Structures are given as structure tokens and as C-alpha cells.
Design a protein with these regions (language model features):
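N-proximal low-complexity "stem/linker" segments adjacent to membrane-targeting elements
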Residues: 1-26
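Short loop->beta transition adjacent to catalytic acidic/histidine clusters or analogous donor-positioning motifs
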Residues: 3-5, 28-41, 61-62
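Short acidic, S/G/P-rich loop/turn micro-motifs used as interaction or catalytic elements
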Residues: 10-17, 46-48, 111-115, 126, ...
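C-terminal catalytic/acceptor-binding lobe
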Residues: 12-16, 20, 164-250
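Short, aromatic/basic amphipathic alpha-helical patches
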Residues: 20-28, 49-61, 179-184
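Active-site-proximal specificity loops/subdomain of glycosyltransferases
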Residues: 42-102
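Conserved catalytic core of nucleotide-sugar-dependent glycosyltransferases
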Residues: 76-84, 112-189, 247
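Short beta-strand-to-loop acidic/aromatic patch adjacent to the donor-nucleotide binding site
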Residues: 99-113
């Protein structure tokens, strides 16, 4: 079994963006699936199950695990909170039963993209170095003085079993900020490999170049196509030409 589980959480409002992300993965892999990573496609309870989305993901990942959330919450933040908590409980159940055996889980949304072809290996190396329960992009704001790590992050598969307060989610605050003090107590690490550009649009190429130079391999938060466009120019096109474009350091 692969060491990393990539989780893409989807509700009906971002099916189109999720499909574009899956298409980008297919273009990056170009017929040769990623190594060391499986995919889990998590639908909110009321979300349709698009055939194209699953077919595209299956081109990039040797294993795709569709899962429909059992929670009924809708709206923000209750909807995504319920999906994440239910998904993580399912992941823990599958590991407790020994059916799965991943080292870590990358929980993501439709506005998260890889900036390099070997992102699974780079994230696994970062996870090994971090030696923590949560690893991702830290922000100083949130519900608690410790700030929070954005929810597009790496988690131990058994995270929700480590503290009884992780068994449910708030309906008034996003889960990653609401539960931040617990994650901090359990152990978290701010890693450069995962970065967040919150609600960003029209991002210029030099921003992605700088992120890559600073070791970012996974980016969340860009709400338009500019991140995907950059990946197509700098990863997909470069692979077809037989080389990679890397920004100069210094």
C-alpha cells in the first residue's frame, strides 16, 4: 500500500473546480500514475457523483477511494466541518481495522494544486522530518492564541482518536481554527512544502516561482485558474519537452 493518502473533499458548489484539478493531475502524470500515494474522493452527503471526476483521478492514482459523508451539515462553516470530521473518523476506522496503513493523510479541497511532479515523495519526506501529528502552513490568526495550521495539511491517520474533543466539529467556526489548540497540544509543524494563499486571485507567475524556490510543493487557496495555468506552463509543458523549469536561487 502507498504511504500517503490524498483526500479531495467536494461539495456540489466546487465540482467543476475539483474536476479541473483532477484534469491537471491527469496532465501531470500523462499516463503514468503517481507513486507512493492513493486518492480518496470525499463527497458531501448531498453532492452529485460526477463520473468524469472519478475517471480523471483514476488516470493519476492507481487507487481511488470514493466516499460519501454521512453528516447532514450544510453551509459554511458547518458543511465542510462535518465532511472533514466524518472523513477523518472513517480514515481512523479503516486503520484501526488494519484495512488501510497510510503514514499520513493529505486533506485538501478543490483549490489546492501541486507545484511539482514528485509532490508525494516531497511531502512524505517533510512528514518524516516533522515527526508530528499535523504538518502544514501555519497562520497567526484564528480562534486561539496559538494561531492555526490551514486545514489543507498532512495529518496522522489516527488524529481524531487522540483526543475526545476531536470527535465533533463546531458549527460557528472553521474546524482548523476551532480545533487548533488541540492540534497544537498533540504536536504540529509549520512546513515550507505546504503553503496557503487565502482566497487569492489573479496571482502573478513570480509568486509561484518564489514559492517553488522556497521549497513549496503543494499550494492551497487560489480561487481562479492562475495556479493551474502556472503548473501547466512550468510542469506539464516542461515534462513534454523533457526538462523542468526551475527558478534561479538568489
Amino acid at each position: 500500500m502507498s504511504r500517503l493518502l490524498y483526500v479531495l473533499q467536494v461539495w456540489h458548489g466546487d465540482v467543476d473546480m475539483a474536476t479541473e484539478v483532477a484534469r491537471l493531475h491527469a496532465e501531470i502524470t500523462d499516463g503514468t500514475p503517481y507513486q507512493d500515494v492513493d486518492a480518496m474522493l470525499v463527497y458531501r452527503r448531498d453532492c452529485p457523483r460526477p463520473k468524469e471526476l472519478e475517471e480523471l483521478l483514476s488516470k493519476s492514482f492507481s487507487v481511488v477511494r470514493p466516499y460519501r459523508s454521512r453528516r447532514h451539515e450544510t453551509g459554511f462553516p458547518a458543511g465542510p466541518n462535518g465532511v472533514w470530521c466524518d472523513m477523518m473518523q472513517h480514515v481512523a476506522t479503516m486503520h484501526r481495522s488494519k484495512e488501510w496503513n497510510y503514514d499520513c493523510v493529505l486533506t485538501t479541497e478543490a483549490d489546492a494544486v501541486p507545484l511539482v511532479r514528485d509532490w508525494p515523495q516531497r511531502l512524505l519526506a517533510a512528514w518524516d522530518r516533522a515527526d508530528s501529528i499535523v504538518a502544514g502552513c501555519w497562520h497567526p490568526n484564528g480562534e486561539h492564541a496559538v494561531g492555526h495550521i490551514n486545514g489543507n495539511a498532512l495529518f496522522d491517520p489516527m488524529t481524531v482518536t487522540l483526543d475526545p474533543r476531536l470527535s465533533g466539529c463546531s458549527t460557528r467556526a472553521a474546524w482548523d481554527t476551532y480545533l487548533a489548540n488541540i492540534f497544537h497540544q498533540l504536536g504540529w509543524e509549520d512546513i515550507p512544502e505546504i503553503r496557503n494563499l487565502y482566497q487569492a486571485r489573479n496571482v502573478e507567475s513570480f509568486v509561484f516561482d518564489h514559492l517553488l524556490r522556497d521549497d513549496c510543493v503543494w499550494l492551497h487557496g487560489v480561487k481562479d485558474s492562475t495556479a493551474r495555468d502556472w503548473v501547466r506552463r512550468n510542469v506539464v509543458s516542461s515534462q513534454k519537452k523533457g526538462f523542468f523549469i526551475l527558478p534561479q536561487r538568489g
